[in-house]
Amino acid sequence: MGCVKLVFFMLLKLDLLEFKNMFTVNPNASDYCYDYTDQRMQSYPRTLFWNKSTDCCSWDGIHCDETTGQVVELDLRCSQLQGKFHSNSSLFQLSNLKRLDLSFNDFTGSLISPKFGEFSDLTHLDLSDSNFTGVIPSEISHLSKLHVLRIHDLNELSLGPHNFELLLKNLTQLRELNLDSVNISSTIPSNFSSHLTNLWLPYTELRGVLPERVFHLSDLEFLHLSYNPQLTVRFPTTKWNSSASLMKLYVHSVNIADRIPESFSHLTSLHALYMGRCNLSGHIPKPLWNLTNIESLFLGDNHLEGPIPQLTRFEKLKRLSLGNNNLHGGLEFLSFNRSWTQLEILYFSSNYLTGPIPSNVSGLQNLGWLFLSSNHLNGSIPSWIFSLPSLVVLDLSNNTFSGKIQEFKSKTLSTVTLKQNQLEGPIPNSLLNQESLQFLLLSHNNISGYISSSICNLKTLMVLDLGSNNLEGTIPQCVGERNEYLLDLDLSNNRLSGTINTTFSIGNSFKAISLHGNKLTGKVPRSLINCKYLKLLDLGNNQLNDTFPNWLGYLSQLKILSLRSNKLHGPIKSSGSTNLFMRLQILDLSSNGFSGNLPERILGNLQTMKKIDENTRFPEYISDQYEIYYVYLTTITTKGQDYDSVRILDSNMIINLSKNRFEGHIPSIIGDLVGLRTLNLSRNALEGHIPASFQNLSVLESLDLSSNRISGEIPQQLASLTFLEVLNLSHNHLVGCIPKGKQFDSFGNTSYQGNDGLRGFPLSKLCGVDDQVTTPAELDQEEEEEDSPMISWQGVLVGYGCGLVIGLSVIYIMWSTQYPAWFSRMDLKLEHIITTRMKKHKKRY
């Protein structure tokens, strides 16, 4: 027997070592590590110290039965394991396991093996956040002794409706079920374990009506069903069996069928209620005021109205969110709640609150997050806010607060956004001495004074928005040198002067730089070439005196470039590289002194403009993940007017070269930029014809070629541009008949004035019989009769979301990016045939 037992332990050790050797140890594999109570854990490589010279039952993460010596527990959570988890893993030789935890590792691309269902004695199984993928096998439902099952992951795990029902039916001993973010796409059956204490099913595509039996589970402590918009929840009108035990109820973004019933008053143990985005309406439900043990109450993103009650019974409150509702009245209740000594978060943004913030508020020494943005609050910001010792985030933006920004007592500030108010005075020194400040947004106020070089001491700063104030002086030289985490810099629309003398250091993180609307002089700083992540550069409306900085084209991420309204001059020369400005979506060089021909090589490099993204489900914004605190600002001219665009859609593509001294012909290569929405070449000295290739600009909405020397006829093919909303061809030398078509028939006289040779609607000079323009359909028929070679028009309707934009807006906010696209182009021979038939002895365009 001794030999048999020895062999058994040797085999057991070999199985464990073989399992260890399947994976590498990588600290990044357990980056985000939490225990089941959502407390952050420290990861460490448990298997690193396993070796064959020691007893495997003493190894970290392993627990053996004292009698049999069998491994009964294997806890490898947060063990930094990385690699493929194979279905023939030696792990499955440990047939006596009762607890198995492999959570918070990285098994990317691995399927959950059906062999997990062979651990018949298993009571705890946790495979969470380890990047498993595919379908959860039905064999998991064979683990009839399970008390805890956690398989939550963001890596496209799914569980078919049948398997979900089977799992709930067979696992009758379950205490905790966590399938967070697993695609279930099913209703919830009513036959599930009566022992459940924790039921976590958020983001699981649940639908139908939640069985009322869930609320009568006598041991239920935590119910999490959030983010299932197709799930309908009806709360019992009578007392729940779980009333005494239920501590956390998360039903955010589900469909609440009826009003909150009086039965809520009996939830005496409830600590946290998340009921945002549930279409709640009317006044804040009165049954909630009896929840005297509540610590977290989130009712935001609903349609609640009326004043905010005093809430004096919530003495244990830590987190309160009523934002994005229709609440009105003042904030007087803050003066009456002196017992809120534990309050940490107060979120009342986006309501209709009015009046000043009460000045006699006390007892909020633990308040760390205060959100009152987008209301109608006024008056000065009271001193108690600046005196909060634990303040981390302050958002009072988009109100009408006035007065000075006082010095902050807190040393732990992460975000301060006071933009869009009427604040004045200098930037307080206490803001410039923060060790953890990441977002500082003070734009659109009346802040004055100089920008101190102390701002460079903010080592963690990611967004600095001081635009649209009265700041003067020079830009601190250190801004581009010492703030290595700074992503977005907006100093636009101030009174800053001098040269841009900052040196942008190698390895910086800038994504957006806007210095628009100042009095800056000198040249475009060459060190900008070090901003390799830059997406937006706006130096417009200054007094820069330089030639075109062609080297900016090497910034491979650049999407928006505005150099408008400066003193830039000379021809735009480009190198032989075809990789310059490839991702550019907005190019604004207007109101300068550029001369020579239009930059044909640069226009030919604009690869992003050469395609229409018809498959994007939702529009993306240039400001990506930081949009919550900051949006880019740039001013562009489109449809004849200047606009400050607060958000630039990823699908918006604009070229503005107006008000320069460009001459020569319009390059036909512009017709390859099929994604172009706005083209403005007005007020130059351009000549020649309008290229027929413009017919390919199928999503073009605004075309301005006015005040040039363009001659010839308007190409009849332009009548196919069904999205064209604004057209200005005035003050040129155009002749012939104006094309007829749905869009062209909507343009008035001003689109064509100053062209004495033009005829046809809407002008008073009509086209005679001899001048009648042949439509594209007629041309096709005639060419077929003559058997002439041609490429026929083929309109491919791909569908569209919002159609034409309402009003004059540069951002054209559309919630679908699918548009009609016309892919066929006439070749030169066809062009010759068409123009000859339209007007004998005329030149080709």
UniProtKB/Swiss-Prot annotation:
Stretches in topological domain Extracellular: 20-794
Top-level taxonomic group: Eukaryota
Tagged with keyword Cell membrane: yes
Claim: Metal-binding is one of the keywords in the record: no
Cytoplasmic side: 816-845
Biological role stated in the UniProt entry: At the opposite of its homolog Cf-9 found in S.pimpinellifolium, was not able to confer resistance to the fungal pathogen C.fulvum.
Protein name: Receptor-like protein Cf-9 homolog
Annotated source species: Solanum lycopersicum (Tomato)
